[in-house]
UniProtKB/Swiss-Prot annotation:
Positions in coiled-coil regions: none
Natural source organism: Rattus norvegicus (Rat)
The family this protein is said to belong to: Belongs to the alpha-casein family.
Domain of life of the native organism: Eukaryota
The gene coding this protein: Csn1s2a
Protein localization: Secreted
Composition bias, Polar residues: 93-110
Entry protein name: Alpha-S2-casein-like A
Amino acid sequence: MKFFIFTCLVAAALAKHAVKDKPSSEESASVYLGKYKQGNSVFFQTPQDSASSSSSEESSEEISEKIEQSEEQKVNLNQQKKSKQFSQDSSFPQICTPYQQQSSVNQRPQPNAIYDVPSQESTSTSVEEILKKIIDIVKYFQYQQLTNPHFPQAVHPQIRVSSWAPSKDYTFPTARYMA
């Protein structure tokens, strides 16, 4: 279900992006309204042909509606291609019922075959095992943080030293005491 919602959101975002890049509907209708001439397997449109299009059998409104519908179909096809390509490139887990998974493995139907359908108990035990593993991992990381601190535990205050007033209890650390 999440995958379906995600693909819908991606398709909506792509549609908004395509609408921004697309010229206005009046410009696109005026571009496609003319008759197309064929010459040497190349189609082209001339401004004179677009002016004489009013004498055609269909009105310009019907032509523009057909053009808009065809453009919408092209946009929809492009969006579908992009969403299919995105879904193939990404590695989302496929959500299937157990019967669908089994039928994809066994191509030929076997009337006497017994399918391995996981029961509710087996899925609940697997969830419990996963939770135990997660708890163990969390405990391990907490132990790591306690035994190997990343920051010093105690910060000792530093004594301010002034070069103007020498300290009275100044001693050399290498001097030996004479007794």
